């Protein structure tokens, strides 16, 4: 395995957990899958559609998202929204993210007393 493949693998691993948090936070405002994908990518959270759609279904099955179909437009779209359980998880994950971010900031700046 080359260094580039190794690096890519570690980057993918690092991003994997952040996508759940990003979806839960972003879907506090209801949206459909493709718009969510575009929104996350615009923010620099690069997600592939083949990753996002199964994740949305899994989060819905776990009760962390709710969904409903909007058939008012020419093309029906499934809109997702963070559920109360998803809100609670987002709060826990955000707190932990901030803790980890602070710890890593200390490590990378040499302030890791």
Question: What does each model-identified segment do?
Answer:
Residues 11-53:
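N-terminal helix-turn-helix DNA-binding core of bacterial DNA-binding proteins
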Residues 49, 75-76:
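Short, aromatic/basic-enriched loop-to-helix "N-cap" motif that marks the start
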Residues 58:
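Alpha-helical DNA-recognition elements
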Residues 62-75, 81:
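Beta-hairpin "wing" of winged helix-turn-helix
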Residues 76-93:
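Basic, amphipathic "hinge/linker" alpha-helix immediately C-terminal to the N-terminal HTH DNA-binding motif
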């Amino acid at each position: 395995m080359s260094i580039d493949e190794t690096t890519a693998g570690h980057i993918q691993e690092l991003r994997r957990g952040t996508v759940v948090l990003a979806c839960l936070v972003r879907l506090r405002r209801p949206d459909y899958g493709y718009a969510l994908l575009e929104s996350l990518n615009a923010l620099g959270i690069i997600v592939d559609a083949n990753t996002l759609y199964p994740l949305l279904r899994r989060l819905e099955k776990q009760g962390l998202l709710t969904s409903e179909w909007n058939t008012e437009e020419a093309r029906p779209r499934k809109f997702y929204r963070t559920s109360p359980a998803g809100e609670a998880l987002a709060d826990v994950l955000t707190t932990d993210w901030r803790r980890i971010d602070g710890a890593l900031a200390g490590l990378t700046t040499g302030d890791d007393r």
